[in-house]
Amino acid sequence: MLAENTVLTGRRAITRSYAKINLTLDVLSKRENGYHDIKMIMQTVSLFDLILVDKTHRGISISTNLPYLPCNEKNIAYKAADAFFKATGICGGAKIVIHKNIPVAAGLAGGSGNCAAVLTAINMLHGNPLSNDELMHIGASLGADVPYCFDGSTQLAEGIGEILKPLSPMPNAYILLVKPPINVSTALIYEQIDNAPIEIRPDTDGMIDSLNNNDLYGIADRLCNVMENVTAKMYPIVGGIKTKMIMNGAVNAVMSGSGPTVFGIFDDFEKAKKSADSFAYQFKDVFLTQVLN
């Protein structure tokens, strides 16, 4: 998806990195190195960040439209560019401009998508010295969701997120995203999961069957994220958004990633638009999107 959406104009690459949602998310076990084995189904939606990468002679620079984002080596896009030059031995630089639309720290893989997009763009600007597998390997070292973001669409992710299997695409639907103004610590959510039994786990096989059957309502019925109960206990506003979304006509709703964004699946544009308008009175980060395959 990223390579197809990247346009080269001379020494510049223009690309988009899209948001993802979790149709299912299960945490299976904790490894000795502290990482967790997960099993989840992810889906791309049409909300995107716009990224421009210019090929320069030396140095890496980052600029964004959000003043609070780091524009140094702490930014995952910077890490992506740095990793590319170290992996290839190329002596060069990059000027990276990111226009953020995807909320930060929202459970939507905004940063991971930026990372994958920058790796793809710089690789193309230099004549594709790295294979797709090599890009995926670098991406996995920078973030668990990065490998998924290279191709997006509907995929099953296992391991720590690096073992990917393409699935039948999700049927067309309207996806409403609402992020409350809170910051959730993913590490803290995992810590809570480690210390308490998971009572309800996703029906991953059933979700795959529903995808194979192009059954939107079966997909909606099987939305499940084991992190949701933990996050919602800490931040009741998450549960409140989910309840309101369903009352507004969503076929179903669930939290994405470690949160705090909640998304609802709508089969009718007018219901989705009306719900989005009602949330926009209360929250800044409200986005009416569509499934993207």
Residue ranges, per PLM feature:
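Short, basic/glycine-rich phosphate-binding loops at helix/coil junctions
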Residues: H57-P70, V118, N213-L223
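Solvent-exposed alpha-helices and their adjacent loops that cap or buttress functional pockets
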Residues: V7, Q43-T44, A140-S141, P147-F150, ...
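ATP-binding N-lobe of GHMP and related small-molecule kinases
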Residues: L2-A106, M124, N128-D133, I160, ...
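Conserved, helical-rich catalytic subdomain that frames metal- and/or nucleotide-binding sites
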Residues: D151, L156-N252, D267-E270, D277-A280, ...
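Contiguous, small/hydrophobic- and glycine-enriched helical/loop subdomains that border
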Residues: G93, C115, L119-L156
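Glycine/serine-rich anion-binding loops at beta->alpha junctions
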Residues: V97-H126, A144, V251-F266
